[in-house]
Amino acid sequence: MPSSKFNTPEKYRYNTGFGSYQESEAIENALPIGQNTPQRPAFGLYTEKISGSAFQAVRSENQQTWMYRIVPTVAHLPFEPEPSRQSDHGASNGDGEYPKGSVFQNLNNYRDLTYIPTQIRWDPFDIDTTSDWVHSMRLLCAAGDVSTKSGMGYFVFTAGRSMDAHTAFSSSDGELLVILQTGVLDIKTELGHLLVRPLEIAVIPRGIKYHVSLPAGPVRGYALELHQGVFTLPNLGPLGSFGCANARDFQVPVAAYDDPTDGETGESYRIVTKYNGHLFVASQDHSPFDVVAWHGSYFPYKYDLGRFMTVGSISYDHPDPSIFTLLASSEGLAEVAIFPPRWLVMENTFRPPWYHRNTMAEFMGLIQGEYDARVDGGFRPGGASLHNVMVGHGPDSATHARASDAELLPQKVGEGSMAFVIESNMLLGVSSWAWSKSGKRQLNYNAQTWLGLRSHFKKPQGVKENSPLLNPPRHNMNGKAPPN
């Protein structure tokens, strides 16, 4: 499975590489040679830099990009809070309010969340046919504080229509990982285009403006916004120089720009920015997608999950799920793992994931198919589950029974399936929309999944039992302690 088979053909070309320095120009010779800020950039362009890290960050972690654009970002009217009624943009639910749970509702900076040590699972989320990309985002769970650049937010998006052609969106709150479940995203960014299809992920850095259209109709998927740090590739350790997600398989957009000579000069553009969890809007008389050339290390990218090189045990036991890690965060905040089709060949081994309690919170989603550790039918594409810090979880009772008695032949699992898990070292609070208002939380999750587990313990006869006491009582031949 060196690549996925897509129903929608690719329409853009890309550069490749993760964590590498890139350059691209839509017009030949638009990039300066040997310097960044020439007195007069080529073709009357402006020089603008976007920094994704501190200036003095170590070289391997320094993220910045130089842009050569037609008009600088600063040329816009002042930002104002976006009004609650947006009937002309499809965001109102009819009574002047935003959809409940949407990202732009004031969540009091993640303080109005429910923290509870129970297993949670959600049915597939309904698509909101009236909302565009920005206004379809719903917060499921989160931790941290946006204003101090700490923590992260987990979202589900269910958009039914494209963004207005003259609207651009960016988030000052963090770097966004997009995991598409259904539909197609045609993403136009300041640095070029990304076409994202199911079985592809995309990452949009903090502050990069973009526009999302839906060429194949409604979309649904998952998103993780890192408020601190950026996504990185995990270290490979004993695996050596390659494996899991290889750097060469990440695709980076090439420069593309809106030509101001096409007759649209002077038309108004709406710039929407998420800032500390709130939406703000400004207008300007030129396209924000006017970067003719750029070079740097701070850019959006996408990745085909079918290119993931899976590793596993070829002798015995089920290794830690870290072998499936696709992306990690630079601050050790989160790890993203996927479960693609793979062979299981372990001998004398319970092959599904073992029962587990974890210092990491585990959020799972399903892109397609059926997850091999869940056969109860409750974990479906477009739904999700959350097993928070130190909350027990593992295979459902039917999976345990089946795997305990299975003939251990080489077995291909996950055909036509793709699940993912995002692990975080933070306690995750659940939004009120995810907990109750969405109506998607499965109230019988525990009963359906694990209450069917029964004790199979059989105490052996004639085997010595070791007491935890330093001076255990002596027993007679009947195994009973003598009377005092």
Annotate each language-model stretch with its function.
Residues M1-N484:
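Jelly-roll (double-stranded beta-helix
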